[in-house]
Amino acid sequence: MSIEVVEVKPHERHYGVYVVKFEDGTERIATKNLTPGRRVYGERLIKWGGDEYREWNPYRSKLAAAILNGLKLVPIKEGTHILYLGAASGTTPSHISDIVGENGLIYSVEFSPRVFREFMEKLVDQGRRNVVPILGDARFPYQYAHYVKGVDVVYIDVAQPAQAKILADNADYFLKPGGHVMLVIKAMSIDVTAPATETFKQEINTLKERGFDILETVHLEPYDTAHAMVIAKKR
């Protein structure tokens, strides 16, 4: 038996994010579905006021986890152009696709051919025309420089060492003046022996050394352990 929705309202802080309230008092966040009737990762579809919303699962998306943990700044709105490094099978990119809408664009880089095929099936083949799929290695931005034009945001979520360096290298290529970067730090992918807080500090220092001002840092527990989201802006 499904629980009835009693209200859907815009998030008080974040453009394109909605808060769904259910009759049992629980709340979830969601985005307005750019491709109504279609799911990406088995998420719940919610109809309200003539629109359809996709529930945004914080256990499947680091950005959703950061928002629920109080992230104040998400530099993504309608029409934003984004370079997304580590697109995987498309969970978070699909919600960003909803937010940026038809006038936005997401250049989505994924290294694994198998996962890339899954990304294509779930997003591109399902009609998300604001997604540009790129099979490539985020460590070498020159390999896809001919595909990507200047972007407003570079977002990275990769399970590799030197995550901040990879982000900064891509920002040097593609980030417009005044643009933002969003770094998901996966501490265990960098150093399994060091405390996560030390790894976070190390990656943040790398961004500072590369000319970024750190605007906000949010830890992602309980949704993901030893993870943090960092928002920064190029000086």
From Swiss-Prot:
Its EC number is 2.1.1.-. It is an enzyme of class 2 (transferase). One of its GO terms (biological process) is box C/D sno(s)RNA 3'-end processing. The keyword rRNA processing applies. One of its GO terms (molecular function) is histone H2AQ104 methyltransferase activity. CDD domains: AdoMet_MTases (cd02440). It comes from the Archaea. InterPro entries: Fibrillarin, Fibrillarin_CS, SAM-dependent_MTases_sf. Keywords: Methyltransferase, RNA-binding, rRNA processing, Transferase, tRNA processing. S-adenosyl-L-methionine binds at residues 91-92, 110-111, 137-138, 157-160. NCBIfam families: PRK04266.1-1, PRK04266.1-2, PRK04266.1-3. PANTHER family: FIBRILLARIN, RRNA 2-O-METHYLTRANSFERASE FIBRILLARIN. Involved in pre-rRNA and tRNA processing. Utilizes the methyl donor S-adenosyl-L-methionine to catalyze the site-specific 2'-hydroxyl methylation of ribose moieties in rRNA and tRNA. Site specificity is provided by a guide RNA that base pairs with the substrate. Methylation occurs at a characteristic distance from the sequence involved in base pairing with the guide RNA. Interacts with nop5. Component of box C/D small ribonucleoprotein (sRNP) particles that contain rpl7ae, FlpA and nop5, plus a guide RNA. Belongs to the methyltransferase superfamily. Fibrillarin family. This is Fibrillarin-like rRNA/tRNA 2'-O-methyltransferase. It comes from Pyrobaculum aerophilum (strain ATCC 51768 / DSM 7523 / JCM 9630 / CIP 104966 / NBRC 100827 / IM2). The lineage of its organism: Archaea, Thermoproteota, Thermoprotei, Thermoproteales, Thermoproteaceae. The gene is flpA.
